[in-house]
A protein has these predicted regions:
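N-terminal glycine-rich anion-binding loop in soluble enzyme alpha/beta folds
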Residues: 22-60
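Anionic-ligand-binding alpha/beta catalytic cores of soluble enzymes and soluble regulatory domains
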Residues: 144-226
Length: 300
């Protein structure tokens, strides 16, 4: 009897821990908050389960910018627990024959999205466990069948909420697909002695800092160390946009105000900034799959 009660207690504890993670629904869109689109999505999710925990990742993705949507998922996903469900709606192809999918990562999170490149970076960094196509006959908001332009509300928020609340299992999302997604092409980060190259996936928008996909591990492989003077080149495609020298430092206050610097951002990736100024604005630098950066030790 005591053993049975102990087992039930343990299962209850495990169940409530799992339920908390499974009930996390995280929304990302390019809708902004200027109108009622995001509220409609939340209303649909709340209608599925009044106890659902709904969070916002961001709704300020620039319109149609699939690449930035991909990066924001990568930036945040690893900090959310197993069982969390992300709904990402950056969908310029809404209403076309592009697939609507749910990707389960090897770390146990779920991503509900059009298969249009949005899942590129989470697939590459967290790994793909499996992918399922959303069966819209089973997983679509009732009464929305005539709507072709708001799948974020009618399909993605609805399916994400059903999955997060436990109303459906992952297997009930729809048929399993090959374990791959549409991937955007970009410059993969790489290192050689004294030099690293990579992509500029995003800007630290508030401050104008330039973030790369070059990890601190690659910097170590290149034998680049704190206080080295580095030559930095930034290009858009084949067109050079910036070239200059700057120190590699730990933080902003290590250089005078207005001076350039290389540092590691909060994701431990190589970044470029001006202390208390806007590097991207001053040098007309942007981000995306076509924006690349080269950082190397300057010749003495």
């Amino acid at each position: 009897m005591k053993k049975t009660l102990a087992t039930l207690f343990l299962l209850t504890c495990l169940g409530s821990s799992s339920a908390y993670a499974d009930n996390a629904l995280i929304l990302q869109t390019d809708f902004s908050l200027k109108d009622g689109a995001v509220s409609a999505m939340k209303g649909v999710a709340f209608g599925v389960d009044h106890n659902l925990k709904i969070f916002d990742l961001t709704h300020e993705i620039p319109p149609y910018n699939i690449w930035e949507g991909a990066y924001r998922l990568y930036q945040t996903a690893s900090y959310w627990p197993q069982g969390s469900v992300f709904v990402s709606v950056v969908d310029p192809g809404v209403g076309t024959d592009r697939k609507s999918v749910v990707l389960k990562t090897k770390s146990g999170q779920y991503f509900v999205s059009p298969d249009n490149g949005t899942l590129t970076l989470v697939a590459q960094t967290l790994g793909i466990d499996s992918v399922r196509e959303i069966d819209e006959k089973a997983n679509r908001l009732k009464g929305s069948e005539k709507s072709y332009t708001f799948h974020g509300r009618d399909v993605y928020a609805y399916t994400g909420a059903r999955l997060a609340s436990g109303a459906i299992t992952f297997e009930q999302v729809g048929p399993e697909l090959p374990a791959k997604v549409v991937e955007l092409s970009y410059q993969k980060a790489k290192a050689t002695k004294g030099e690293v190259k990579g992509n500029i996936p995003i800007l630290d928008i508030q401050y104008g800092n330039v973030w790369s996909n070059i990890s601190d591990e690659l910097l170590n492989q290149a034998e680049i160390k704190l206080n080295d003077t580095l030559c930095v080149t930034i290009s858009e495609g084949s067109q050079q946009k910036y070239a200059g020298k700057m120190p590699y430092v730990a933080s902003f206050g290590d250089v005078p105000e207005g001076q350039p610097m290389v540092y590691l951002n909060s994701l431990l990736n190589v970044s470029v900034a001006l202390n208390m100024d806007n590097f991207a604005q001053k040098h007309q630098v942007a981000s995306g799959a076509d924006w690349n950066i080269d950082v190397k030790k300057c010749a003495k």
